[in-house]
Curated annotation (Swiss-Prot):
Keywords: NAD, Oxidoreductase, Phosphoprotein, Tricarboxylic acid cycle. This is Malate dehydrogenase. GO terms for biological process: lactate metabolic process; tricarboxylic acid cycle. The keyword NAD applies. It comes from Geobacillus sp. (strain WCH70). The keyword Phosphoprotein applies. The modification Phosphoserine is found at residue 149. The lineage of its organism: Bacteria, Bacillati, Bacillota, Bacilli, Bacillales. Substrate binds at residues 87, 93, 125, 156. The active site is at residue 180. HAMAP family: Malate_dehydrog_3. It holds the Pfam family Ldh_1_C.
Length: 312
């Protein structure tokens, strides 16, 4: 029997999609198919070819193709969805809902048709609602449809903590709960630097400022760029999740998972600590929360539900 490389399709060849494809190829996680709409087929092919031509220099073996034909994605092991319109300065995530929901429905139909056994990771904003849309549209079990926000939000939190303490980011661990928006809940009590609780290392006022900056992290970059939104850190976060599934690493990572009673919520996609491995979301980890944290999470859930109400 011939051993085959894994196949990963990335839907949406904008900054985030293309960067994700490039990181996946560099990590040799599988062959990569980069997909966009027919009007953008040539630029998509150009990006894929450009990446492929870097492989002799960077020393990775992975085939990368660009296409607008979903038939090229057939039998993908993992499909990453980054397609959708981007958020512009002054635009709330909620403004994106109706347009991106239509895009999610179209994309999901094609994905399911050609890769009925794949795992789907959704990045498109507002990500909690878009992941729910893909879940409903696909008919897949909940463990195979996953949203990405917590890895990114936690990466931002870890970055700011490392800067504050002037230490390696590798030594900082943390968790962000809830929706991917201004009401996310960075769990300071469960965050450490070199195994030492952050509360022992950083004064409360500084920690509060870091939490606030984490909440506004996406908006900070949108405003600095002036056009478009973050893509390097989101792409790296997607690649970490893809790697956890493909290599069956059983990583404890924050992910947007479908809740059926965990944390007291039902029938909603929300950012929670999960075990991510070869079977997708293998477990939702329930942490003990203080009353204050529960209240913050409830506020975050309400924000997600407000977006969900816009869904058609």
């Amino acid at each position: 029997m011939t051993m085959k490389r894994k196949k990963i399709s990335v839907i949406g060849a904008g900054f985030t999609g293309a960067t994700t494809a490039f990181i996946l190829a560099q990590k040799e996680l599988g062959d990569v198919v980069l997909v966009d709409i027919p009007q953008l087929e040539n630029p998509t092919k150009g990006k894929a070819l450009d990446m492929l031509e870097s492989s002799p220099v960077l020393g990775f073996d992975a085939n990368i193709i660009g296409t607008s034909d979903y038939a090229d994605t057939a039998d993908s092991d993992i499909v990453v969805i980054t397609a959708g319109i981007a958020r512009k300065p002054g635009m709330s995530r909620d403004d994106l809902v109706t347009t991106n929901q239509k895009i999610m429905k179209q994309v999901t139909k094609e994905v399911v048709k050609y890769s009925p056994n794949c795992y789907i990771i959704v990045l498109t904003n507002p990500v909690d609602a878009m992941t729910y849309t893909v879940f409903k549209e696909s008919g897949f079990p909940k463990n195979r449809v996953i949203g990405q926000s917590g890895v990114l939000d936690t990466a931002r939190f870890r970055t700011f903590v490392a800067q504050e303490l002037n230490i390696s980011v590798k030594d900082v661990t943390g968790f962000v709960l809830g929706g991917h928006g201004d009401d996310m809940v960075p769990l300071v009590r469960y965050s450490y630097a070199g195994g030492i609780p952050l509360e022992k290392l950083i004064p409360k006022d500084r920690l509060d400022a870091i939490v606030e900056r984490t909440r506004k992290g996406g908006g900070e970059i949108v405003n600095l760029l002036g056009n478009g939104s973050a893509y390097y850190a989101p792409a790296a976060s997607l690649a970490e999740m893809v790697e956890a599934i493909i290599k069956d690493q059983r990583r404890i990572l924050p992910a947007i998972a479908y809740l059926e009673g965990e944390y007291g919520y039902e029938g909603i996609y929300l950012g929670v600590p999960t075990i991510l491995g070869g079977n997708g979301i293998e477990k939702v980890i329930e942490l003990e929360l203080t009353e204050e944290e529960k209240a913050a999470l409830a506020k975050s859930v309400e924000s997600v539900k407000n977006v969900m109400r816009v869904l058609e």
